[in-house]
Amino acid sequence: MNNMDYDPRSMGSYGPNYNNFNPNFGKIRRHKNTSYPGYNGFDPSDGPMNGPMGGPMGGPMNGPMNGQMGGPMNGSMNGPMNGPMNGPMNGQMGGPMNGPMGGPINGPMNGPRGRQMNGPNNGPMGGPMNGPMNGPNNNQFNGPMNGPNEYYSPEDSDGSDYSDSNPNEFDSDDDDIDLSYFQKRQYDKPTYHKFEVTDEYLADYLLRKFGLDKDKVVRSIQKNKKDEFKAMILNYFYKENPKIKHQSINNQYKLFRKWNKSGLKIKIDDLETYYENKVKPHMH
């Protein structure tokens, strides 16, 4: 085809059947200028960036930045980033963007970061994060995220499980312990018994707990008991002598002194206090 051939720029890096991001793919150029001095089969409008053979960046063999056929990203053979064989950054086959086999992350064979067995990110066997066998973080069954929870089982640092252990059961290793140290200590070994709380112990405990003076507490208790006994004697006196409550306090006390055989001296003030509080309010 003379003036009806395909624009080489529209063929992309992989020939006329592969459209590598070129919107002009398949378009026919109808007005090629063949009178350009030194015409070599391509229009000068191909420009220094897009010339398939002799542009300053797209030379067929020795372009300073391009591979044999393509631009700096799409060279099919020897591009510095996408060469299928000897790219300086890629594995055996592919480029970092379009290489079919060995990109820097997914190369299956010889990529510097995508080795077949021990690649650090995506190697199928020994990646540090996802390798099921020999990854540095995920061993065969002990990965902290994907393992079967060894880090959370109730095991001791030596691997022994003490979740259901009995403190009275001893391992066979205990038979090897040297007991000579214990044999040197001679004393009576006490046996535990349930502690019995006596009243005396309880009283002492409460006195200490609340910071009370024992003597003061004892005197207070004795006084209260004495007052209770006085009230009981006076109550008997008025029950046995119901008519005496209509007499004066002096006459009541004279009779009381003769009546009282309790052995406790009760003053007239005690009798009057009891009369005013317990007897007089109930008189009719």
From Swiss-Prot:
Residues 110-123, 130-149 have a biased composition (Low complexity). Signal peptide: none annotated. Keywords: Virion. Its main location: virion. GO terms for cellular component: virion component. The keyword Iron does not apply. It comes from the Viruses. Residues 110-176 are annotated as: Disordered. It is found in: Virion. The keyword Protease does not apply. This is Uncharacterized protein R727.
